[in-house]
């Protein structure tokens, strides 16, 4: 019997993607990587696809498509990224940068997938819409980046009515190095 969780990883070649892949490597008995995307790093995407035998693969920027050598078929473009997020799975991890993750994240929720999201911009720009849709679809939105995950964990265990405002900072992504 297979009780593994099926995972789709959007933004596999970035810092959130790398962290997620380390976790998946350490827990191969618990997770299947069923979908993966990168923006333009086709070579690293190929390595990931070959290592995990990922069946659903997207490169959102077509410029480097000739550098892809993964063993499974590659789909290209932003519309393919949105279609990838709609594939039924247990969790879509979105490590996409800024508002580029807005449509794929909404597609994931609309398809009934739980969403582990690493960027703040998506929820800042469309938080009410996302929360309404997640409630309607009975799915969870889980923050995975350090700052908003810490805030989520604090608020989850305390009385939220005692909070007047929350200030978010940035330390990863382009600020990492």
What is the predicted function of each stretch?
Residues 95-96, 108-124:
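ADP-ribose/adenylate-binding Rossmann-like module
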Residues 41, 60-66:
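Short, polar loop motifs at secondary-structure junctions
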Residues 13, 49, 57, 92, ...:
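Residue-level signal for inorganic ion chemistry
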Residues 53-55, 71-73, 111-114, 136-139:
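A short helix->loop->beta-strand "cap" motif at the edges of active sites that frequently abuts
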Residues 58-60, 73-80:
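Short acidic-hydrophobic, aromatic-tinged amphipathic segments that line or gate anion-handling sites
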Residues 1-54:
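N-terminal Rossmann-like dinucleotide-binding module
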Residues 107, 127-177:
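Rossmann-like NAD(P)H-binding beta-loop-alpha module
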Residues 76-107:
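Beta-loop-alpha module in the N-terminal Rossmann-like domain of NAD(P)-dependent dehydrogenases
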């Amino acid at each position: 019997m297979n009780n593994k969780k099926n995972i789709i990883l959007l933004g596999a070649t970035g810092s959130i993607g790398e962290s997620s892949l380390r976790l998946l490597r350490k827990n191969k008995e618990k997770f299947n990587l069923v979908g993966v995307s990168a923006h333009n790093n086709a070579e690293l995407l190929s390595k990931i696809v070959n290592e995990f035998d990922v069946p659903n693969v997207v490169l959102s920027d077509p410029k480097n498509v000739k550098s892809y050598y993964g063993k499974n078929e590659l789909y290209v473009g932003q519309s393919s990224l949105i279609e990838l997020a709609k594939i039924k799975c247990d969790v879509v991890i979105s490590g996409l940068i800024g508002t580029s993750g807005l449509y794929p994240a909404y597609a994931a929720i609309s398809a009934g997938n739980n969403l582990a999201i690493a960027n703040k911009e998506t929820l800042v720009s469309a938080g009410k819409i996302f929360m309404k849709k997640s409630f309607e679809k009975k799915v969870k939105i889980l923050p995975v980046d350090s700052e908003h995950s810490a805030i989520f964990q604090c608020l989850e265990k305390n009385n939220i009515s005692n909070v007047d405002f929350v200030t978010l900072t940035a330390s990863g992504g382009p600020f990492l190095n």
